[in-house]
Amino acid sequence: DHIFNEWQEGCIVVDPAGKLVVLIRIDDSRTNDLAALVSVTDQRTITFNPATGFCDMPGGGKKFTVRYDTVSGKYWTLANPCYDKDRVRTHTGWYSTRIYPIFLRSRLVLCSSADLRNWTVVKEVISSNNCFFHGFQYTDWEFDGNDIIAVSRTAFPESRGLPIRQHDANMLTFHRIVDFRSAGFTTENITYDQL
């Protein structure tokens, strides 16, 4: 019942049972908040069960990194979810009828899961109302004590103007997410009037 454009950019992780799995982003043209959990049997064998292998994951359609935290006993990720309020927005040209979910990257959220299948949005890290020209994407990160340090491929206005679109990054940005386990950080809200 799913419509896929592609599966790509998997993240290898050890599941709660101690087995190696690949959590793969899925470009599902309808929702874009879906990922696939593929089991690694050995060096030459992976398996996927369509009845149980899909998981609802905020931002599962865009590249993400998942890491396990021994302190909280949870898996964590930074992702770009697809909010309904953004899905219906329009702009000139490419986005004259709507913005496709694969391009919604203006909100970066911290998510957690105890089992890699059930994901919860903990808190927004960055939230911009400009889904056409702002993008905080392809984020890679590490734990740093009680914080997360992250690098984002970012599309954002600068002295030469706007980036071509949110996917076409014009800078790399560094972020520190303070006290991530307790969501002790402040969301960076960006309101951009020149849409």
Spans of model-derived segments:
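Beta-rich carbohydrate-recognition and catalytic domains
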Residues: D1-N5, E9, V13-P58, Y68-F132, ...
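Beta-propeller and closely related beta-sheet repeat lectin domains
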Residues: Q8-C11, K62-T65, Q137-D140
